[in-house]
């Protein structure tokens, strides 16, 4: 009879009471967002017309390391937290690796992903301020599903702009959003000025997160008592996601180990930051030697092949200018099935950390990600979301290095969600119909060159 522990479970009483703000401990703080017209730094109050005031304050807070989690949000967290930390014995055996592989299983949330951690917080702060309507964008639909759940929980009306290619590829996520009462529109659409402009110039545009953000912001700015919310990129979103890593810290203690490597897939940064930043505070404050690896799709390689500079967070240029690693806000990503990772830029915190060489980034081809996802499903019994497959692929790469070197390193990655509503993507993979998309240096150079107009 085996005495090995597979899952490490914290009781409900151990749900964290505070989120961790890594900016307070960073040696170089992220540069400020700028007003596009004046190029002057923004204050939190400048963001109040778009975001709930508490969220704008969190966005600009670079001094307080800990932010209290409201009781109302913690009560909602009790529906699914604490989430399990799992030792991937099956994957280890299949790889023949001496590495110890752990994953934080965020797929157990009511909507199947980590996105609910911030959705509940953002909906709460909007409700507390007296807001009645909120808008958002969504790529693969994970964020839209989470926010639709949260909006219903706190009595808010929600309008979602869903990237067109995902709207078509993932109809059941659209159904989930509509089940919770959200209005869902394929983006780009004819319902906004930004959408109409893009469709006039590119009638067959398949959509991007940058485009959907533009439409959601435009609707929020033109609707009374309405605020915009978003699922990644900005610092307050990543703040809420640190509940993942804070729980994982305690669970790794239960396992009697500490990670040598921490891996998260990367679209805008909230998932990666959520698992890694609570551990990173020990690197920043105590010099703890841990590697932090962001795994992005090679078809959208903002961290590995982009440039660090100020850029808009959306295609139409409605957002402030943000200091980020970017491929250019006009970048049109390939129609990969990891819809949640199809974004042109990186969040300001991750961008600064990468610039300071406190973390690493790798790019993963689409087929390699699905290879890893299927291996994980076959060995651990969970079909991962296509986005999470990128983190698994990066973990597999590192585990194979351990096989070659004989080093028993401890690897931790975040399984951000399950893929049970992404089976059309797996169908195409299994039929041999998926391909890799690679960008030429010339394509990237041309797109980044358009940023010169920003100044």
Write out the residue ranges for each language-model feature.
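Alpha-helix C-terminal capping segments
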Residues: 121-131, 145-157, 178-179, 276-286, ...
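Active-site/ligand-binding loops adjacent to catalytic centers
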Residues: 66-68, 197-236, 244, 255-256, ...
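A short, small-residue-rich loop immediately preceding and capping a beta-strand
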Residues: 118, 126-165, 258-272, 292, ...
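Claisen-condensing/thiolase-fold acyl-transfer catalytic domains that form or cleave C-C bonds
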Residues: 266-274, 366-424, 428-432
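Positively charged, low-complexity intrinsically disordered leader regions
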Residues: 3-131
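Active-site-proximal loop->helix
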Residues: 143-206, 302-315, 423-431
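Active-site nucleophile and cofactor-binding loops and adjacent substrate-binding regions
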Residues: 105-116, 134-143, 234-237, 263-268, ...
């Amino acid at each position: 009879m085996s005495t090995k522990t597979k899952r490490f479970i914290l009781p409900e009483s151990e749900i964290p009471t505070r989120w961790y703000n890594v900016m307070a401990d960073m040696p170089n703080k992220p540069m400020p967002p700028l007003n596009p017209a004046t190029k002057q730094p923004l204050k939190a109050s400048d963001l109040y017309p778009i975001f709930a005031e508490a969220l704008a304050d969190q966005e600009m807070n670079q001094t307080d390391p800990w932010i209290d989690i409201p009781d109302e949000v913690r009560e909602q967290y009790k529906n699914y937290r604490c989430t399990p930390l799992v030792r991937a014995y099956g994957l280890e055996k299949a790889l023949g690796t001496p590495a110890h592989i752990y994953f934080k299983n965020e797929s157990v949330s009511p909507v199947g992903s980590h996105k609910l951690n911030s959705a509940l917080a953002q909906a709460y702060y909007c409700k507390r301020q007296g807001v009645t309507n909120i808008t958002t964008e969504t790529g693969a639909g994970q964020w839209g599903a989470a926010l639709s759940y949260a909006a219903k929980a706190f009595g808010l009306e929600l309008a979602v702009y869903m990237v067109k290619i995902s709207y078509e590829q993932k109809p059941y996520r659209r159904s989930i959003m509509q089940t919770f009462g959200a209005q869902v529109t394929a983006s780009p659409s004819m319902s906004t000025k930004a959408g109409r402009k893009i469709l006039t110039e590119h009638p067959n545009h398949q959509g991007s997160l940058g485009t959907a953000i533009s439409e959601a912001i435009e609707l929020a700015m033109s609707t009374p008592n309405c605020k915009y919310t978003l699922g990644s990129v900005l610092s307050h979103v990543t703040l809420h996601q640190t509940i993942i890593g804070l729980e994982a810290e305690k669970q790794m203690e239960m396992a009697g180990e500490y990670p040598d490597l921490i891996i998260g897939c990367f679209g805008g940064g909230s998932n990666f930051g959520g698992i890694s930043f609570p551990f990173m505070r020990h690197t920043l404050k105590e010099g703890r030697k841990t590697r932090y690896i962001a795994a992005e799709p090679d078809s959208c390689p903002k961290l590995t092949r982009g440039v660090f500079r100020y850029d808009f967070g959306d295609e139409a240029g409605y957002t402030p200018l943000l200091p980020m690693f970017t491929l250019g806000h006009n970048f049109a990503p390939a129609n990969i099935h990891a819809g949640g990772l199809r974004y042109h830029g990186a969040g300001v915190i991750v961008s600064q950390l990468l610039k300071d060489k406190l973390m690493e980034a790798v790019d993963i081809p689409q087929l390699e990600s699905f290879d890893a996802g299927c291996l994980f499903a076959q060995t651990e019994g969970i079909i991962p979301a296509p986005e999470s497959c990128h983190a698994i692929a990066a973990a597999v790469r590192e585990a194979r290095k351990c096989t070659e070197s004989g080093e028993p390193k401890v690897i931790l990655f975040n399984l951000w969600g399950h893929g049970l509503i992404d089976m059309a993507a797996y169908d195409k993979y299994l039929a041999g119909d998926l391909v890799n998309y690679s960008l030429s240096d010339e394509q990237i150079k041309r797109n980044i060159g358009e940023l010169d107009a920003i100044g």
